[in-house]
Amino acid sequence: MLVIGLTGGIASGKSTVARILERLGATIIDADLLAREAVLPGTPAHRAIVAAFGTEILLPDATIDRKALGRIVFANPDARRRLEAITHPAIARLSQARLAEARRSDAPAVFYVAPLLIEAGAADRVDDIWVVYADRETQLARLTERDGIGRGEAEQRLAAQMPMDEKASYGSAVIDNRGTSEETERQVVALWKERIEKNPR
């Protein structure tokens, strides 16, 4: 069973590529979904986040207000490091369990979709890395539209991540997602045929 890390910068199009891969038959494990699960009310990570950042980052139902917390951590590198020290180990535990389960399945490949795959030191959990690439202006345009934030806040979020060109250097495959959805799909299908269908494991 081949486990491939799918990573890329914020708003580069990882979810779009993951949906294409799922249609092709891949099993998808999404680190963003695991991150939400890891900080549900009652979990140790939830308690640690509230202790570190206060109850003002909670919604009325006691779940974490991701936008409020995001405004804090993207503006303050120390706060971001404090948050990551809490969340990364919790996400790692969940992802290791899901990956172990997925390795026992009969899917042709498992893709672990993780924006911080490299930064979180999780690259050793996968057999290969594919990077979804978009240039800075494309990322900014998508991020402001998707999250309803201003350009300044979008730039802060980009600045908090590894530069896209550096991240691309870690991939054995780079999917250029600056063009149309059809162009992206053609690249993904070609990679699937070349890397997965021709090399079943």
Curated annotation (Swiss-Prot):
Q: What range(s) does the DPCK domain occupy?
A: 3-201
- Recall the GO molecular function terms of this protein's record: ATP binding; dephospho-CoA kinase activity
Q: Where does ATP bind?
A: 11-16
- What Gene Ontology terms describe where this protein resides (cellular component)? cytoplasm
What EC number(s) does this enzyme carry?
A: 2.7.1.24
Q: Which PROSITE patterns match?
A: DPCK
Query: Where is it localised?
Result: Cytoplasm
Enumerate the UniProt keywords alphabetically. Answer: ATP-binding, Coenzyme A biosynthesis, Cytoplasm, Kinase, Nucleotide-binding, Transferase
Q: Which cysteines are joined by disulfide bonds?
A: none
In its UniProt record, which GO terms are filed under biological process? coenzyme A biosynthetic process
What Pfam families would the database entry show? CoaE
Pathway it works in = Cofactor biosynthesis; coenzyme A biosynthesis; CoA from (R)-pantothenate: step 5/5
Catalyzed reactions per annotation: 3'-dephospho-CoA + ATP = ADP + CoA + H(+)
ATP-binding as UniProt keyword: yes
What does the record give as the function of this protein? Catalyzes the phosphorylation of the 3'-hydroxyl group of dephosphocoenzyme A to form coenzyme A.
Q: What family does this chain come from, according to its entry?
A: Belongs to the CoaE family.
Annotated protein name in UniProt:
Dephospho-CoA kinase
